[in-house]
């Protein structure tokens, strides 16, 4: 199987999108990511990343939806619904944080 990686859409960082606290934007971003995956022949995406970034030295906190568990949950929920509505299976990552 060959996956075309020549053209890719890039969104702003997840944490910045969640700071807008606009559910429709989170859902639309998920749809756009899902459509890109489907267009490239990908059935399952390893995302979104749901780590709440409790430890600042973690280094990848910008990938998540922020440190608030409720806001992170809503952000992930809307993103997953958007991705899956486009026909790709979402697989939330890093959900449990020690």
Across the structure, where does each feature detected by a protein language model lie?
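Glycoside hydrolase catalytic-domain context in secreted enzymes
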Residues: 1-98
